[in-house]
Amino acid sequence: MSMKQPVRVAVTGAAGNISYAMLFRIASGEMLGKDQPVILQLLEIAPALDALKGVVMELEDCAFPLLAGIVQTDDATVAFKDVDYALLVGSRPRGPGMERKDLLEANAAIFSAQGKALNDVASRDVKVLVVGNPANTNALIAQRNAPDLDPRNFTAMTRLDHNRAMAQLAGKTDSTVNDVKKMIIWGNHSSTQYPDLTASTVNGKLALDLVDRTWYEGTYIPEVQQRGAAIIKARGASSAASAANAAIAHMRTWVLGTDENDWVSMGVYSNGEYGIAKGLIYSFPCTCTNGDWSIVDGVDVSSAFSKEKMAATEQELSEERDAVAHLLP
């Protein structure tokens, strides 16, 4: 197998739990393919640089054939220099007594700076995935601070929600996730997201013909919406490995394409599709080909139930945007 030229992959919050579950898989070729060498450009805050050094030592000790180089830094302009892919994992977690608005503002400062740095030094075709929460609004903040980059280059991760929704449906219908197609997560990566089974199939049969409507509305949707909180309660820590897995899958799909007759959920720049306000980063069903995404057309969202759920999560995203509006260029 002939090797390609190395590509540059930036990861922020690189000494954190999600990154620890992700970096070794990126370096082994799981994200971009077994013929694609990578240079990892790792960003951390100064107090975590020692911890990052330990992670880098471990990466070296794996002797990955595809790992063509490693940069470790606390300077965003160094980390993002010429990068082709940027996974923005690091964010300010919610501390005791912090209101959601405080959290939004603390993260706005981080993602404004990162958006500016990407704008200044990244590849013009950089693909950006925001994992750090609140992911949709953090992606919007970064995008607004990078006026020279195409807004389509900025995405937020709802693939974890998508995967959670697939797993729950497979469990209920006594099938495997391979049997589940055309899952949709609409809206925000938060508890207002709308896991929509209207178009979903299991083994070619419509999902909503196989499950009870009461279960769907009363059990399934809240379970998917609140799965992250359930994991924190059970594990005493937030989901890291499953988030890392979803981030790798999101990027891999964006770069290498979706399966035929299926789609994925991605938080992407709204151009008014399905009546969603333009400029929000909203999760839509998407297909990917040739390194580009497009929103799936023609999903039936005419039911009062769908309209209400899609509007509620859109409203939350609008409120988040308005809370940081004074910080947006």
Curated annotation (Swiss-Prot):
Record-linked Gene3D superfamilies: Lactate dehydrogenase/glycoside hydrolase, family 4, C-terminal, NAD(P)-binding Rossmann-like Domain
Molecular function (Gene Ontology), one example: L-malate dehydrogenase (NAD+) activity
Catalytic activity: (S)-malate + NAD(+) = oxaloacetate + NADH + H(+)
Described purpose of this protein according to its UniProt entry: Catalyzes the reversible oxidation of malate to oxaloacetate.
Stated name of the protein: Malate dehydrogenase
CDD domains: MDH_chloroplast-like
Family: Belongs to the LDH/MDH superfamily. MDH type 2 family.
The entry's keywords: NAD, Oxidoreductase, Tricarboxylic acid cycle
SUPFAM superfamilies: LDH C-terminal domain-like, NAD(P)-binding Rossmann-fold domains
GO biological process, one term: tricarboxylic acid cycle
EC number from the UniProt entry: 1.1.1.37
Annotated substrate binding sites: 94, 100, 133, 164
Residues binding NAD(+): 13-19, 107, 114, 131-133
Active-site residues (renumbered): 189
Top EC class, one word: oxidoreductase
Taxonomic lineage of the native organism: Bacteria, Pseudomonadati, Pseudomonadota, Gammaproteobacteria, Moraxellales
NCBIfam families, alphabetized: MalateDH-SF1, PRK05442.1
Pfam families given in the database record: Ldh_1_C (PF02866), Ldh_1_N (PF00056)
